[in-house]
């Protein structure tokens, strides 16, 4: 659309429809917006916008409502995302700072985002495939069983049972654990698996080489299992109060398909620029149950370059360097996402601001930087 006035008319229609969920007429627009032209001129502009696919007239005598194309143009070029107020930011910090651990923080974040937007909020736990090792402990639990407790850089804790024919020597096991913590801290789980295999091949660990391979397989499993990322959801009951949301049953079905949601929202958050917000509207979600919904999401906890390079020093003493690059992660890649799901007539500007603010807070939480503002 080359004409700036038509752009103003489209923005006015979208904003009014978001507020009222009623078809918008030219008389209303000229009365409520300073467009500087007559109602007849606005009516002609609306007809042109309809011809171009940005608006639709549900009934002959009714006003017009935005189409997906209209919403998309609004989100991409016309919507102004206003930062949250100081009071809202303080509220977010106050509510989330009372959490005791990562799980509690993510649960609180989902509840808070649902409360702010009045829509469904979804927060994913940091993916193990995008995490690095912070610490590991290996402890005996029976005569032929060990428990490996793995803590990642994002605070996630994973436990794995390691079955052995006989418990290893305590000194050797302690030495292996200490070396893993020294050499593999800050290294991706895939490369940690390679590092552990190389340790197990050394003479000093010959007696526990089978254990080392079992442990390496456990690290591989953690790195490969995207399903290990938990989803925290809040606000689903709010959908029932959205009187204009069509096809509620398919929408609830879509919310139950957590793997589908994970792929959709992860993909959307990863395609945004640093600190950005991604929006998928209706059919853009490629999800049948979300044809009448929009998804707003942002990544959080972005990785650093150190996380991708950490394997170099870990492998130096273990003769590695068959690093094909398959495990390389781009610096700044989000480790998880936070998002909001609501009707296509959602308040995009407010939702985008809220999602971005919560994502920033979670990034600061993972970085242990409580002083960073959630703007």
Curated annotation (Swiss-Prot):
Keywords annotated in UniProt: Repressor, Stress response, Transcription, Transcription regulation
Disordered: region residues: 307-331
Biased composition (Low complexity): 307-318
Gene Ontology process terms (BP): negative regulation of DNA-templated transcription
Tree of life domain: Bacteria
Entries under Pfam families matching the protein: HrcA
Keyword match Repressor: yes
Alphabetical list of Gene3D superfamilies matching this protein: 3.30.450.40, Heat-inducible transcription repressor hrca homolog, domain 3, Winged helix-like DNA-binding domain superfamily/Winged helix DNA-binding domain
Stored SUPFAM superfamilies: GAF domain-like (SSF55781), Winged helix' DNA-binding domain (SSF46785)
GO MF annotations in UniProt: DNA binding
Function noted in UniProt: Negative regulator of class I heat shock genes (grpE-dnaK-dnaJ and groELS operons). Prevents heat-shock induction of these operons.
Similarity comment text for this entry: Belongs to the HrcA family.
Name of the featured protein: Heat-inducible transcription repressor HrcA
Source organism (scientific name): Bifidobacterium adolescentis (strain ATCC 15703 / DSM 20083 / NCTC 11814 / E194a)
């Amino acid at each position: 659309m080359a004409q700036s006035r038509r752009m103003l008319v489209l923005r006015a229609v979208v904003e009014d429809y978001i507020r009222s969920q009623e078809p918008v007429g030219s008389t209303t627009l000229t009365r409520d917006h300073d467009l500087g032209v007559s109602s007849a001129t606005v009516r002609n502009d609306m007809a042109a916008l309809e011809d171009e696919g940005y608006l639709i007239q549900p009934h002959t005598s009714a006003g017009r409502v935005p189409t997906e194309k209209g919403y998309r143009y609004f989100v991409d070029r016309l919507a102004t995302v206003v930062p949250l107020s100081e009071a809202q930011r303080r509220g977010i910090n106050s509510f989330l700072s009372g959490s005791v651990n990562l799980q509690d923080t993510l649960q609180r974040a989902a509840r808070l985002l649902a409360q702010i937007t009045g829509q469904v909020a979804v927060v994913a736990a940091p993916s193990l495939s995008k995490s690095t090792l912070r610490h590991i402990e290996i402890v005996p639990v029976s005569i032929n069983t060990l428990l490996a407790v793995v803590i990642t850089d994002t605070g996630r804790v994973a436990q794995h049972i390691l079955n052995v024919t006989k418990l290893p020597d305590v000194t050797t096991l302690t030495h292996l654990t200490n070396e893993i913590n020294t050499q593999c801290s800050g290294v991706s789980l895939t490369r940690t698996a390679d590092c552990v295999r190389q340790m197990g091949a050394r003479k000093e660990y010959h007696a526990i080489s089978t254990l080392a391979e079992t442990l390496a397989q456990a690290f591989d499993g953690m790195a490969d299992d995207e399903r290990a990322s938990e989803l925290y959801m809040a606000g689903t009951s709010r959908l029932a109060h959205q009187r204009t949301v069509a096809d509620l049953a398919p929408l609830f079905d879509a919310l139950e398909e957590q793997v589908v949601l994970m792929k959709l929202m992860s993909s959307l958050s990863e395609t945004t620029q640093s600190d950005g917000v991604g929006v998928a509207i209706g059919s853009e979600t490629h999800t049948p149950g979300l044809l009448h919904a929009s998804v707003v999401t942002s990544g959080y906890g972005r990785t650093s370059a150190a996380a991708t390079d950490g394997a170099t020093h870990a492998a130096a003493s273990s003769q590695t360097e068959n690093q094909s690059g398959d495990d390389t992660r781009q610096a700044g890649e989000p480790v998880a996402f936070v998002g909001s799901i609501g009707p296509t007539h959602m308040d995009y500007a407010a939702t985008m601001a809220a999602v971005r603010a919560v994502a920033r807070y979670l990034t600061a939480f993972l970085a242990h930087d409580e002083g960073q503002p959630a703007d």
